[in-house]
Amino acid sequence: MKIRNIIAIPITIIAFGLNIMTAHCQVPCGIYDDAVRIIQIREHVTTIEKAMKQIDQLINDETSAQNMNQLVRWINTKEEHATFIQSIIADYFLAQRIKPKQNNEPGRQQYVDQTLLLQQIIVAAMKSKQTMDKSEPGLVSILLNQFVELYFDEHGKNHLNTIQKGK
């Protein structure tokens, strides 16, 4: 009985703990904060940019076990944060916030434009994983700013700016 509990407790913690890493729980709770998701993506971009700088520095430094260890860690960090961006876009915005519009339905073009921008962000995040091209995280930022302009009304933009400054 005790061994089963010893095994079950960590499995439960891991299973529920992994949910924290996703963009949103996908339970139809109605609790959303789009501006916070934008800020999270911006933080992930900053982390990817820093990781790329650190990787470049470590590649040029002397080869040592410590440097190789740090190199692997920064590469993993870059990959993880690009994946977080993809997850927020796919699991939060595309799956839950951007509502499909049929042809000739009001808002159809905005839906198409938003969806195309989000897909481009996912691809730029993917390229941030695949390469050390420092323009890719910058492209994520550019595309994200374009999405903000399309997605938020003036009140939403003001809210985003207010909480961004309050960080």
Regions of interest found by a model, annotated:
Residues M52-Q96:
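Alpha-helical segments in soluble extracytoplasmic regions
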Residues I9-N19:
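Bacterial N-terminal signal peptides
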Residues M21-Q66:
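Immediate post-signal-peptide N-terminus of mature secreted/exported proteins
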Residues L117-K167:
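C-terminal amphipathic alpha-helix
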Residues M1-P10:
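Bacterial N-terminal signal peptides that target proteins for export
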